[in-house]
C-alpha cells in the first residue's frame, strides 16, 4: 500500500491540477536528504532531477534500511506512476480536492496488475483506453463503481460462470512490491456485472468453493468483490480492514462497506464486519473470528458441506 503522493505531484493549470509522475533519481535524492521536521509533509525539490515525494513517505520505498517498500528504481514504478497520472488527468481535480486525492492509500500490487493487463494484447484493457482509465480510477478510489470482472486487477482465471469470475492472484511474480513468501496463495472473486445475481449462479460458486477451496475462508474488504484467503491469514486481513475502515471514517472518506452475500461469505467474517460497522472495538470484533458459530440452515438444498477425507481438495496444502 502507498499514498498517491508517492507516485506523482500536482501542477496547477488554470483552476485545476495536472499530475506529473516522479522519476526515480528525484526519489533517490529525497531519500538521502536531510529535511527539517516542519517540511516533512511538503513535496521535495531535488534541484537537479525535479520534484520528489514528501519525505514523510520515505518508508514507502525500498532502501538498504527498509526492504518492505516499493522497488522504485524499476521500470514498473514508472509505468504505474504514468498510468495513475493518465487517470487523474482524465478527470477534474480542484484545489479543494487535491490534498484528499493525494493522501489516498492505494494497492500497489493492484496497480501493477493493471499495467500487466494493459500490456497484454489479448486483454480487453489493451484495446480500450476508456475501460483502462475506468479500471484505474476504481483502483485509486476516484470512482464510486465497484471493481467488476472487466475492470478487475486480473490474475489467472480459475473459475467462471454467468455471474462470477475467480482469479488466482499473481503477486509472487511482481516487480514493484512482490510477495516474498513462496507459500502465498490467494484468490479474488469479481462480479461479471454489477446487477442482481440468480440463485443458481450463487449455488454454482458456493459448490466450487466448498469442493475445491475448503481450506480457505471467503471474506470481503467491503469493496464489492470477494477474497479467498488461507485461514492462517484471516487475523492479518482483519487488522488491515479494521484500520482502513477507521481511517476512512476519520478522514471523511466514508464509503459504504459492502458486506456482500451472506451465503458466500465465511460466517465468522460476516459477524466480524457487521460488528465493525456497528462501531465496536477491534478486540470485540476479532473475538467473533475465533468463536464457534451456530451452523446456519443450508440455503441450498442438496449442497452438503460434509466431505470425507479422501474427497477433500488438496488446493492450499
From Swiss-Prot:
HAMAP family: ROTA_NSP2 (MF_04089). SUPFAM superfamilies: Rotavirus NSP2 fragment, C-terminal domain, Rotavirus NSP2 fragment, N-terminal domain. ATP binds at residues 107-109, 188, 221-223, 227. The keyword Magnesium applies. It holds the Pfam family Rota_NS35_N. This is Non-structural protein 2. It is an enzyme of class 3 (hydrolase). Its main location: host cell. Its EC number is 3.6.4.-. It comes from Rotavirus A (strain RVA/Human/Philippines/L26/1987/G12P1B[4]). Homooctamer. Interacts with VP1; this interaction is weak. Interacts with NSP5; this interaction leads to up-regulation of NSP5 phosphorylation and formation of viral factories. Interacts with host DCP1A, DCP1B, DDX6, EDC4 and EIF2S1/eIF2-alpha; these interactions are probably part of the sequestration of some host SGs and PBs proteins in viral factories. One of its GO terms (cellular component) is host cell cytoplasm. Belongs to the rotavirus NSP2 family. Its cofactor is Mg(2+).
